[in-house]
Amino acid sequence: MQTLIFEDALCAQLSPLAAARPACSLSIGSVTLLERLLPFGQLLTSLRPHLRRYLEQLAGTRAPLWGGPAFAADGISIPAAAARPAETQSRYGSLLLVVNARVVPSRESLLTLRSIVEAGHRGIVRTPSAVAAALLHCSPTHDGPDDRLLQMLLAGTAAADTTELLKAHDLVELDAMVDMLEWPHELVSFHELALAGSLAVRLDSGTYAELRPGLFVAPEAHVADEVVVRQGPVVVEAGAEIGPFVCLDGPLWIGPHTKVNPHAWLRAGSAIGAQCRVGGEIEASVMEPFSNKAHDGFLGHSHVGSWVNIAAGTITSNLKVSYGPIRLPARPGHPAGRVETGRQFLGALIGDLAKTGIHTSIPCGATIGVAATVSGNVPAWVEAFTTTLSDDGGLPSRTTGVQAATGLERMMARRGVELLPADRDLLQLLAENA
């Protein structure tokens, strides 16, 4: 069996969170869609051109900037140890599961996709505006209509092509439904709904020891005796270190090799990715791998990309003074204008490689672009590759791809990760198109 994850035109609308990474590599409820689909067998991707080029250059030499599974030179993900491709291949043979990269990787989505595969009926799952998934039957001789469709999907150069190719193919509509992302703030909403189920899936593996009621710890993790667990589940992955006098409220996930500094308060609904450094107060937020929020400050109802540094004293507002619903700022050149989130609590949406200065204040619903640098009182919208020092009264300045790569190289060195030419080329391309 094979699985193809494809990006459609609306993936770009998830920027800044999905500007420098595939939408299927965004974390929701402690897991990405790509990780959810690894057990389904050999995994292929059809991504936006700049990401396709990046992964081709990377050619499996290292995991991509955003962490997670590595990719081989042909764009096929290298399966994790938890995957069972041989078993899946023998059971489902020539089936091809096609999944939109914007599908929410919840436990419910996983069960729906599994049921589609188990039933084995060739068909398509639609939403009013998109194709969510499809199941195709490939031929043993690789010359059937679904085989030809697969080759066209893999060769596609425009995101819209994939959706149109699937819609035009002769497929029966399947009676199934999965949640899909449309706007970046929905990552916060779906994360809140998915985290408990995601942790339940992890705990079902039986690899965690319950050190005390509600605290589940993987081997080689260290939790100081003085840590307080007020409610569970709190799941701590291998190699993580939690210092003394930390307060933990579940549901909470702490990723592999992440360090939690003494006196931190990690509140319910948070998921801290691999190799992060965290301190202060964090509530109902996602931090993608390799990011820092090591000092006092508050991060609430936010989504933070990879290789982000949140400096000491940085505070995100997550509730309006009026207690009213929060709106996302209007995107330059986008016809939608301001986006009604319907959320009373919403912090910041921070793209990969962004940085804040000390004592930075970030308003509700702020959107901070890839490789942006902010300090002082931050505006609601910050373009990618800009430096916005609002307290000096000046206009934002541009950050070049070379400058962003230099800063990233220094940050990577502290994690023992090498910056590769493919990383530099990706940043240069993103900077040129910012």
Regions found by a protein language model. Give the residues of each.
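Terminal amphipathic alpha-helical/low-complexity segments used for targeting or macromolecular assembly
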Residues: 1-214, 220, 386-434
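Glycine-rich hexapeptide-repeat left-handed beta-helix
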Residues: 10-13, 25-27, 262-263, 277-434
